[in-house]
């Protein structure tokens, strides 16, 4: 929890309580359904929660923003972002049903009414969104066709509506393969933990 309050200093009591509840909830569910690797569960706040919140350092979602989280797994980055932005609407999808079960159970325990989670492939999602977020799902070039037509035009943020990828390592080849303009935001510019030295938020747009 100290990691979260180190970088996000204006959280409400309710937000603080929600973030504090994540560790016991995920440990309990992970014992039943392996949604987070066993070696990472003790570093939940560093490797999953704070990592997810790096997106908030790139774009500060305005009230009413609609966000789609593709391949959410156990709820990352969607659940931490939904706690941080209670007045935004989040749709979380994953092709593995048991993971979505965990997401729904945790969102319900936290009372997060701004999350809807579905056992669904990205291609089958209906509606349009201001931003699409995703973490460690697939290469950019493969991902883009899945979400074609799912972005609302332009928007009201400094960054135009687009896709925010949580990525790691050298992305030069992946970016070239995508044939898209991709903007890179090193997470080490926002968080000083060693874990983030090679981590980035990659941003691009697709019509």
Segments predicted by a language model, with ranges:
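A short, conserved alpha-helix within the catalytic core of class I
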Residues: 140-151
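Conserved alpha-helix/loop element of class I SAM-dependent methyltransferases that forms part
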Residues: 28, 32, 45-63
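Active-site capping/gating segments
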Residues: 168-207
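Conserved SAM/SAH cofactor-binding pocket of Class I
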Residues: 53-134, 144
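Conserved beta-strand signature within the Rossmann-like core of class I S-adenosyl-L-methionine
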Residues: 155-170
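Conserved hydrophobic residues forming the short capping helix/wall of the S-adenosyl-L-methionine
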Residues: 30, 106-107, 151
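N-terminal auxiliary segments of SAM/dcSAM-dependent transferases
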Residues: 1-38
């Amino acid at each position: 929890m100290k990691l979260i309050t180190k970088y996000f200093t204006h959280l409400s009591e309710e937000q603080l309580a929600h973030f504090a509840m994540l560790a016991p909830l995920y440990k309990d569910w992970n014992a039943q359904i392996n949604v987070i690797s066993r070696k990472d569960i003790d570093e939940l706040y560093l490797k999953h929660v704070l990592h997810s919140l790096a997106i908030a350092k790139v774009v500060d979602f305005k009230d009413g923003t609609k966000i789609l989280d593709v391949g959410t797994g156990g709820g990352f980055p969607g659940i931490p972002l939904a706690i941080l932005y209670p007045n935004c609407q989040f749709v979380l999808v994953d092709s593995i049903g048991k993971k979505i079960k965990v997401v729904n159970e945790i969102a319900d325990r936290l009372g997060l009414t701004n999350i809807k989670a579905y056992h669904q492939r990205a291609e089958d999602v209906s509606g349009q969104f201001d931003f699409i977020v995703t973490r460690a799902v697939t290469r950019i070039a493969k991902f883009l066709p899945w979400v074609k037509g799912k972005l609302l035009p332009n928007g009201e943020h400094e960054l135009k509506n687009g896709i925010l990828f949580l990525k790691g390592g050298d992305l030069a080849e992946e970016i070239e393969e995508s044939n898209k303009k991709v903007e890179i935001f090193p997470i080490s510019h926002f968080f000083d933990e060693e874990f983030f030295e090679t981590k980035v938020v990659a941003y691009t747009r697709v019509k």
